[in-house]
Amino acid sequence: MEKKVRFKLRKVKKRWVTVSVASAVVTLTSLSGSLVKADSTDDRQQAVTESQASLVTTSEAAKETLTATDTSTATSATSQPTATVTDNVSTTNQSTNTTANTANFDVKPTTTSEQSKTDNSDKIIATSKAVNRLTATGKFVPANNNTAHSRTVTDKIVPIKPKIGKLKQPSSLSQDDIAALGNVKNIRKVNGKYYYYKEDGTLQKNYALNINGKTFFFDETGALSNNTLPSKKGNITNNDNTNSFAQYNQVYSTDAANFEHVDHYLTAESWYRPKYILKDGKTWTQSTEKDFRPLLMTWWPDQETQRQYVNYMNAQLGIHQTYNTATSPLQLNLAAQTIQTKIEEKITAEKNTNWLRQTISAFVKTQSAWNSDSEKPFDDHLQKGALLYSNNSKLTSQANSNYRILNRTPTNQTGKKDPRYTADRTIGGYEFLLANDVDNSNPVVQAEQLNWLHFLMNFGNIYANDPDANFDSIRVDAVDNVDADLLQIAGDYLKAAKGIHKNDKAANDHLSILEAWSYNDTPYLHDDGDNMINMDNRLRLSLLYSLAKPLNQRSGMNPLITNSLVNRTDDNAETAAVPSYSFIRAHDSEVQDLIRNIIRAEINPNVVGYSFTMEEIKKAFEIYNKDLLATEKKYTHYNTALSYALLLTNKSSVPRVYYGDMFTDDGQYMAHKTINYEAIETLLKARIKYVSGGQAMRNQQVGNSEIITSVRYGKGALKATDTGDRTTRTSGVAVIEGNNPSLRLKASDRVVVNMGAAHKNQAYRPLLLTTDNGIKAYHSDQEAAGLVRYTNDRGELIFTAADIKGYANPQVSGYLGVWVPVGAAADQDVRVAASTAPSTDGKSVHQNAALDSRVMFEGFSNFQAFATKKEEYTNVVIAKNVDKFAEWGVTDFEMAPQYVSSTDGSFLDSVIQNGYAFTDRYDLGISKPNKYGTADDLVKAIKALHSKGIKVMADWVPDQMYALPEKEVVTATRVDKYGTPVAGSQIKNTLYVVDGKSSGKDQQAKYGGAFLEELQAKYPELFARKQISTGVPMDPSVKIKQWSAKYFNGTNILGRGAGYVLKDQATNTYFSLVSDNTFLPKSLVNPNHGTSSSVTGLVFDGKGYVYYSTSGNQAKNAFISLGNNWYYFDNNGYMVTGAQSINGANYYFLSNGIQLRNAIYDNGNKVLSYYGNDGRRYENGYYLFGQQWRYFQNGIMAVGLTRIHGAVQYFDASGFQAKGQFITTADGKLRYFDRDSGNQISNRFVRNSKGEWFLFDHNGVAVTGTVTFNGQRLYFKPNGVQAKGEFIRDADGHLRYYDPNSGNEVRNRFVRNSKGEWFLFDHNGIAVTGTRVVNGQRLYFKSNGVQAKGELITERKGRIKYYDPNSGNEVRNRYVRTSSGNWYYFGNDGYALIGWHVVEGRRVYFDENGVYRYASHDQRNHWDYDYRRDFGRGSSSAVRFRHSRNGFFDNFFRF
């Protein structure tokens, strides 16, 4: 029979205890309550649920008397009940109150059979090994070597059904508060919570609003936050009972070997060796050197982190209890002990700790201090953000540097903008691009870069002892993101080792290129000797906006002629001023950004930057490839073939063909051709045969649009007047292009293409022509025999509307025609070989006919598929297709970066493993295959290309290195891409763990610095030159065998958080294992810490709130984080509230002490301030928020129209700057703000995304009504949109029409509307009405301006006229039959006849409406009228009658 006992529990040394009648072991259970969420912070609405058991081995517990009232009638004599305690009192945030001395509990004893399941939980087991121990009085006794014992504790958690208690909810809102909230517009109460809505109906989030002097805060959900002050009762931890594990959990010794650390610093993922482990969850056993446990199992930086840990681990271990912020430290310690017991049980069962490592790491990532939340703001960098390393940190001196000279771009190489270069008004680039940013200003690093360059250029020799497998040249990646000294180093090396400055042949054989986007880079390179060539970015943009963009975004076509490094109106120079290469797309340009756009729009709108998954990429390409085949494209490029028709026929630049324009970007290498493959291949082959000579381009306005023509005169002819020789006559090419699919030429239009004097009276045939279905290629004279055209005696090809019109199909949105001479030999080759004559002008590369003859092939795509078998590797496929590349005329093959890729997934490059995200720069498939094959495959591919005379280009990527395998602690500051500290960041001279060390066992260890001695001996001049950015030469004295932080400027943020390296918050001191300066959490090292009561956390001392860290230190002049909340404690150690100035910065703290972070403060009058991620108020200047900007002046956020440095800008109600936006401002005026600067536009036209045009006056206001601008009379509707192709009725009621192209008011011209109706506008631009004589024709225009055609018009006197349905001319002397079947006859004055008349010799009758009724009496009964007429203008009528009987009334003959 069950026995129910009533116990009274007494207090012993500030702890509640009850004693088992069977032993001296005390079982203490904690308080019960309701189930809450693990991340709950609402103290008012939630209680705590627990059933953890803590066992305290102290004899003093047995001294306490226990009073029980027996309420049962019988019990077993052998029962040894274990007390199980259930609290009947609901827990509140004062659960640690220790003033009461007794408490009543219901205790349900267990039976003997139940106790048999407890695995000897109350036994002391003797062992053969001595261990350190605690005496009954709490004294710590070292182990005796001759004896040993282990202490066994219970592993049984007695299940308790919690008694649910409802907490009394403290009211944080007074009646005055409620009234104040109710008086504010847009604050509404929804489901018991208050929310503040913006005018557009969206919620204000992270928004502090001052109402009548009191601040109300609306949190990240938009709900009004609870500003209740913390409990005034301190967190008193009864460590001698509730933290009884502490003595065993102390560290074995403070030697660093007993910790997992990074550079002697502890991190959130550090493990350590405790003195004891609770083996199998039962027995405290002295640890071995293999027994490491996570630090977070026994120590936490604050109580909130401990609570989060307990809740997280409970969920992982199947313990169904959670704890809210009202939970006491006593309860959390008990829960943590239960978790530790469970962990040890599982370690024994699993026989490893791998699972625990994964679990702890996963928990760490949930804490804002240890994840990317504390690294905000984001989006100012390709990988969310960058970190700059300190040069003079005392804490991480191993990472210090004397260099880290940032942003030394070609424009800014000396640290000041070079006045010679003004095309780009910026400094021409920025330092931080990706990953570990290499410090290319460091002379030791510069020497290593040279060493690596030499390795690449001699790869075959070094790796395979085969010089035929050496690379010939390089592509320099990301020039605008590295120190420009590297350009001198590379150029000097190419001159010294390859002799590129000696003659054109040497230069062309080692033709190296730059990826340098700034407009200043090309002139800089030219001034440096043209040792390498750069892209013609202006031409790329011209191709993009004239041809590739959607129709409503296209510019005119003239930029294709003039917006380039070369004006091609008449390009007849032997040698261009500046050499260059040109392209329309590349592996990372106009490909990955299109994929990003698709992912954001249709797959994952929350994607940041270029951090895609492979699954997202796969889905995006399904859309991309489908779009490529569409006539109306949403994402992909239009008119790719048109771009290549110009690229491959232009003079004075080396064209580069992109792999992804011939083969699909995804899929196996060269497996799937694109729709543009045939057109590009045809152009490549034709280039060998025809493309040579001078060039002339023209823009012609024809019909309703424009076209451009481009002519190459042929080999030997630089000008149109040159007659050349036989080869001249059979070479040359004409390209005709339009970018308007609605292009229509007028009948009188002629497109005249001057092929030059060498081509008079010559047959030409099409190479490419546009058809309804796409582009038709003609590969021979025979194929195009029926389409031959001849030049006239001036050498002109002439085309008409019959030849040229606009098309819309998947390949062409506009028009393309390419024409070549008939009669060229099949093997004609007009290319020019490079000269070996010495170069004497101080330049290495010259853009002459020989360089023009070259073609580069960028032979890879970022997104090509991973090989599934050996034969699919890129380099294997390349080797098999070298004949094809030679047929195309490829002279320079740009290989993919051949480096084994990182797989960290931190950026697109490491996801797709394209070779740019490497950890070992010397591993070209040596250690294992990369995406493109093995090092041996690379050797074979290079040799195969060389066998066809094709030069091979390596990708030199000196900017970054990814995810190095070894970790290092650095002192870092969160910066933007220029290295400027980011406002609002928590990371300022903060210790941070980076992936900054290479292994020391890789190819870097083998080859790093290995060639420097050889290079010094061969080319000593390279090491004598003082570099521009540093003023000192390279330093070859150090060979970098292992990369480390001292060689980097910094890295991208890694998501480890601002607090990952652990410290004591109160003293702001990092926990360190440095032998002479060891500083560790006290609970790990102090044998007395944990055996007496201690105070931690927020404590009210009667005067104010103070804070004690878990190490027992009081916070003074310190910021303290408790979970996600931050507080500040002043010089006296008291928590502050309200506005505060601390160390020169402004902060704001709510009434409960919580600091405003990432929040707006509204003073109640819509004057806004912003407090950043570090709590500092933003003071002056522009600040980036994601992709948007805000502006602040003296701490006030700009809202509305704001004048800044003389320019007017606009900031919306949330403070975000308008860029590229049309804004109706508070005065009701429409304005536009520039897409780049954000400045208000004035005296300028602007086109919106719909293709509509606006004109903004000198005040920046959109004009409306009629305006004369540059001699044109224009009209702008009330919404500011310019009328184009529209009929507008002016204020006087006059109808006017505005030209669809120019928008100019139409005068003295006919216009037809969409219904086919015609209007005539007079010399004043007004639609005419009534009768008009125009060009000898008498016409009529109705009152709405519509011309009468095929209509009866009744004039004022009721007389009727009729106007021809085709010409609109007034009909005279003709019969007319209307649609109703009635016949009329119009006399020589144009009026319809009425009454009896003799018409064409017959007497006929017309009624009062002019309708023909009958002829003379003798005809009307016997003849049926048969009318035949010619509808031709001015024709005569013919009438005949035939005999017929009909059913008409007598005397009435109806027709």
Swiss-Prot record:
Changing residue 1326 to V: In strain: MT8148. Changing residue 21 to I: In strain: GS-5. Changing residue 116 to A: In strain: GS-5 and MT4467. Keywords: Dental caries, Glycosyltransferase, Repeat, Secreted, Signal, Transferase. Residues 250-1050 are annotated as: Catalytic. Its main location: secreted. It is found in: Secreted. One of its GO terms (biological process) is glucan biosynthetic process. It catalyses: [(1->6)-alpha-D-glucosyl](n) + sucrose = [(1->6)-alpha-D-glucosyl](n+1) + D-fructose. It comes from the Bacteria. Residues 64-121 are annotated as: Disordered. Changing residue 256 to V: In strain: GS-5 and MT4467. GO terms for cellular component: extracellular region. Production of extracellular glucans, that are thought to play a key role in the development of the dental plaque because of their ability to adhere to smooth surfaces and mediate the aggregation of bacterial cells and food debris. This is Glucosyltransferase-SI. It comes from Streptococcus mutans serotype c (strain ATCC 700610 / UA159). The gene is gtfC.
